[in-house]
Amino acid sequence: TALIGHISRDGTAIEAREKPEKSSKPEAQKKHKRGRPRQGEIRETKQRVIQQQMAQPLTEMVAALPKACDRGVKCNAQGYKNSWNGYKLHLDTADCGIPVSALLTSASVHDSQVAVPLSLMTAKRVTHLYDLMDAAYCSEALRAHSRRLGHVPLIDHNPRGGEKQPFAPHEAQRYQERTQAERTNGRLKDDFGGRHLRVKGHAKVMSHLMFGLLALSAEQWMRLHI
């Protein structure tokens, strides 16, 4: 089995020609008084998506991901926010430029909520050393998960109003490999139909994108062997 150095993980906007599904209003949560709970009072704590995924098999994780067309917002490489109607494609790309795993979700799904299922899919297919992710994936839970799989997590730190923690020099050099994810996203959209959807619905959109990824992978494979 070939050993891959780095897997770059990223989510990219997929614009669709369909109306976004109206989101249902969340159920009103019961409000509690401030302060400590009374003696004998039990307050339910809502589990985060990543915490729930840690206890689920892969099939359940993937099935639970929202897949309807809706509206998404994402910061681009320059720090500006872009919004779109459609979906979001989440990719794991090897440092040779070949996509290894892909999942398509609603546009509004946060990148970090797809990291665990993507990582498990990729771990079944290839052996690699480093997981490279941007600040959207900054989470101690995801770092710990990466280590449990035997990988070294290199995740850009999100200061969230605090002080940013930079990479060590050798980590920063390795993290530069993550530009491969952006190049693959760009090639899929510019050269392999990712920007030109003529179909509607999650299943058909995913099929369209997978044909593009298949062609991209074949071309990249030939480039590596010329």
Residue ranges and their predicted role:
Residues R125, T184-R187, D191-R195, S217, ...:
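Hydrophobic alpha-helical segments
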Residues T1-A135, E140-R148:
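Polybasic low-complexity intrinsically disordered regions
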Residues N85, C96, A181, K200, ...:
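Short glycine-rich loop/turn motifs that provide flexible caps or phosphate-binding loops at active sites
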Residues K200-I226:
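Charge-patterned, long linear interaction tracts outside catalytic cores
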Residues V114, Q180, T184, S207-M210:
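Catalytic-loop motifs flanking and including active-site residues across diverse enzymes
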Residues K30, A135-A203:
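Helix-centered, glycine/charged polyanion-binding patches within enzymatic domains
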